[in-house]
Amino acid sequence: MSEEHLIRHCAPTLAGLKTGSLFSCSFACQQELLNVLRQMNHRLLPKGVRVLPLRLSDNRALIYVYRPKKLSSDIADTVAEQILLRHGYDTAVCEKCIVRLIQRIRSQEKFPHEIGLFLGYPPEDVCGFIENKACNCKCVGCWKVYGDEEAAKRKFAQYKKCTEVYRDRWATGTDIERLTVAG
């Protein structure tokens, strides 16, 4: 996992625009990957960003980059809380939700669709996705939209622009700590 992976897949999270981001990467040695994650957390935790492996298998890692404060706020939403409670989450503590998400990812063949709540997707869109089995959405961008289509399109454009700006700034030498907004 490289800084480039983080910039390419997580710029809106690093910028403080999004609760979390998820990406997959390959690794040759699990211990080396865990060392890189430790180093990245050492650099990003002071800015309020955490990096976790949700799953490691067959030299592939599913990496979750998130802002714990934003996640705590997001899961306090009434609709989000109802979705999580239905799937066995203890919503009182953010860290317990992360542990439950990891359990669900590692133990199920089907991907847990409530993960959208951990990525900052609107709860009505996550609920719509689950209830409609990923069909009948209003539009598709970073996620499938079932609620406010115009607000979602604005977010998609904002995330795209942020990623472009971050990629350009990183390519010209701005380090990841400088690109990560404290929060």
Label each PLM-derived region with a short phrase:
Residues 2-57:
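A structured, charge-rich N-terminal accessory region that forms the first stable segment of a protein
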Residues 37-93:
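A glycine-rich, hydrophobic loop/mini-helix early in the fold
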Residues 142-183:
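Long, compositionally biased
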